Amino acid sequence: MATEYALRMGDGKRIFLTKEKIREELEAGAANAADLGEIPALSGDEIDRLAEILMMPGKAVSVEQGMEVPVTHDIGTIRLDGDQGNSGVGIPSSRLVGCMMHERAFGADTMELGHIDYSFKPVKPVVSNECQAMEVCQQNMIIPLFYGAMPNMGLYYTPDGPFENPGDLMKAFKIQEAWESMEHAADHLTRDTVWIMQKLFASGADGVNFDTTAAAGDGDFYGTLHAVEALRKEFPAMHIEVGMAGEMVLGMHGNLQYEGVTLAGLWPHQQASLVAKAGANVFGPVVNTNTSKTSPWNLARAVTFIKEAVKVSSLPCHVDMGMGVGGIPMLETPPIDAVTRASKAMVEVAGVDGIOIGVGDPLGMPISHIMASGMTGIRAAGDLVARMQFSKNMRIKEAKKYVAKKLDVDVMDLADEHVMRELREELDIGVITSVPGAAKGIAAKMNIEKLLDVRINSCELFRKQTGR
């Protein structure tokens, strides 16, 4: 009897497949992406490599040493303190504690602060509170800390917002009115996100993560791109990540354009250039998981789309890898075997520059991804590599080479805890455990500025406040 391997369906249910069936599913998934996106399918060698990763005997797998990449985040600390029947585990804790847990306990390379609703519009009435939280977090943390939220243009429609719901208008055949409603909502989305980030950047935020961009279709993408453009013009040094909501931009409007390109119907490799033109530093492409298909089918499909996006993008690509995207099952507690295999495949086959950790419980998401492919933050040199990706738009190899040269170590040493522990203490750039007298928070980041020849926004704020 042929050997069967334990794998998953897109909803997380365990299934058993033979090697021949795995390869058949991989080829079908890759072909689906190639057909839809009009892009190259995976080669035979790449299919073989994916099959090899899927059939590895261990429950958890990881990238080859030296191939580690930085991680960014969606949903911030909500996976710890949130409790809405979703992926939050309901631990009563402050957001400062949550952010520091990601930095000190999970080995995150970057982190983000976010409002419990995790959308920009609800932040407006409480922006002063968000600014306070950001400043306190920046005073205590070393890794890059973003403000993260969803553009979520749907909140601008009735009953939550001022503009009539375009879906209702379309049902009444009021097409022109529906278009105008979407255009007004997009303008307000741009205005609100820019205003909020003006406040947060003045409070020391390293930058912004636009998460789940285009969830409300092409109008959502349009408003976000214009927000990125405005922020880049006003704040040349702001770190900006744009993570998408889905693999294709839905044409809710259909006629909206950016830089002469119609937004409706764009696939990841076509979205990348527009995100770069708007002024982002990092692009977060997405491929949705089909819950009725197998994990090999979903993974090959995702890798095919993302590989092409990485190839054509001028920006570092941090693929979104939460539950229900990137070949990962749609389950609040994502299976560790599926998460680590998808993480490894995205790095080794798709060639991504980083992983954007998405929705899922702490063990199933940040811990699994960081164990599989992360650089482990201030345990090693992950925060330094991430800073160069965002400061100079460096792809992963260039960023690693730059940091290694500054530290006078081999690239392989950047994820070596033994090498970096001693070196970080010697350079006084922050260590993960408590060392009396060692630089922490702002002091450590000021030393990082000198080491990497970059400017860090929270340090600039400190100098402004102290007149130094």
Curated annotation (Swiss-Prot):
It catalyses: Co(I)-[dimethylamine-specific corrinoid protein] + dimethylamine + H(+) = methyl-Co(III)-[dimethylamine-specific corrinoid protein] + methylamine. Pfam families: Dimeth_Pyl. The keyword Hydrolase does not apply. Pathway: One-carbon metabolism; methanogenesis from dimethylamine. It is an enzyme of class 2 (transferase). The keyword Lyase does not apply. This is Dimethylamine methyltransferase MtbB2. It comes from Methanosarcina acetivorans (strain ATCC 35395 / DSM 2834 / JCM 12185 / C2A).
